[in-house]
Amino acid sequence: MKKIFVLSVVVLLSFVTLANAGIKTEEIEYSHNGTKLTGYLAYDDSKSGKRPGVLVVHEWWGHNDHARNRAKMLAEAGYTALALDMYGSGKLANHPKKAGEFMNAAFSNWPDSQARYNKAMGILKEHKTVDATRIGSIGFCFGGAVSIKMARGGADLKAVV
C-alpha cells in the first residue's frame, strides 16, 4: 500500500512539473523619479510567437504573492503577464490602515502613479514574446480601480478586467 501511495505521488508531481515546464518567471527592476520598482514577469517559454500581454495591478496591500500568482496563471493560459509595482521600494501593508495610506497616496499623486503604470506597460510591450498591439490590464481592489482609471484616461489597452 505504501508503494502505491509513493508511486501515486511521484506520478502526480511529474504531471505538475510537466504542466509548468515552459513557464518562466523573472523579477524586473525599473524605477521612476528615483523610486525603485520591482515587477514580476511570467510567460510560457515553450510557445513560439507573439502573444497578448497583460498588466496585473496589485491590491491595496502592495506587490505581493497574490499578484505574482495571477501573472503565473495568465502565463499558463498563454499570455505574457507583468505584475507591476505601484508603490515601490518593496512597500507591503499588513494592516488595512496602512494599505489605505498607500492607496490614498497613489491616488493623491495620480500623475506619478500613471507614470509608474506606463513605465511597466512599456517594459511589457518591449518583451520578446509580446504583441505590443494587444495589451490588457487586470486588477483587484486598488488594482481594478487603477486599470479602469488608466483605460478611461486613454491608455493603449485592448481589454480591462
Task: Please give the residue ranges for each predicted region.
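Serine-hydrolase catalytic machinery in alpha/beta-hydrolase-like enzymes
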Residues: 27-129
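Primarily recognizes the serine-hydrolase "nucleophile elbow" in alpha/beta-hydrolase
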Residues: 117-161
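A periodicity- and composition-biased signal for non-globular, repetitive helical segments
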Residues: 8-9, 76, 155
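Short beta-strand-initiation
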Residues: 23-25
